[in-house]
């Protein structure tokens, strides 16, 4: 999954905020992006997941992507999500459009993303991308 961090590094200017939505307890990509020099924030509806990220020195917010607090996302340069539930994908795309930033989704096998997203293969991982 660290290949996703490499892809974001190649595509997104390094002076910005990158937001992972639906982080859960998997922090490897967020940590790798921090190593690359990005300002990273994670978001999850699960308060325990956010507490875990903060404990690992990654800032986080509890937020619901279906009713997002746009203040969290306004300074973002990109949003990404790893294996989100299919019903969340459209909400992520709507959010990315509102704040006008690229969206990167690594799906579970067989999940169908919104039609507007383009499938790319980067170092063996499938990534759906939407760019404004």
UniProtKB/Swiss-Prot annotation:
Q: Name one Pfam family in it.
A: UPF0146
**SUPFAM superfamilies cross-referenced by the UniProt entry:** NAD(P)-binding Rossmann-fold domains
Name assigned to this protein: UPF0146 protein PF0123
Q: Record's NCBIfam families? A: PRK04148.1
The entry assigns this protein to a family as follows: Belongs to the UPF0146 family.
- InterPro entries for the chain: NAD(P)-bd_dom_sf, SAM-dependent_MTases_sf, UPF0146
């Amino acid at each position: 999954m660290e290949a996703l961090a490499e892809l974001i590094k190649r595509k997104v200017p390094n002076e910005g905020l990158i937001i992972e939505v639906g982080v859960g307890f998997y922090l490897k990509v967020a940590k790798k992006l921090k190593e690359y020099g990005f300002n990273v924030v994670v978001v999850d509806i699960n308060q325990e997941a956010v507490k875990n990220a903060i404990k690992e020195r990654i800032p986080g917010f509890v937020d619901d992507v279906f009713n997002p607090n746009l203040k969290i996302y306004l300074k973002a340069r990109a949003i990404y999500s790893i294996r989100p539930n299919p019903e969340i994908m459209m909400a992520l795309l709507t959010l990315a459009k509102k704040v006008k930033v690229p969206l990167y989704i690594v799906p579970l096998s067989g999940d169908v993303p919104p039609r507007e997203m383009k499938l790319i293969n980067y170092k063996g991982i499938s990534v759906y991308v939407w760019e404004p």
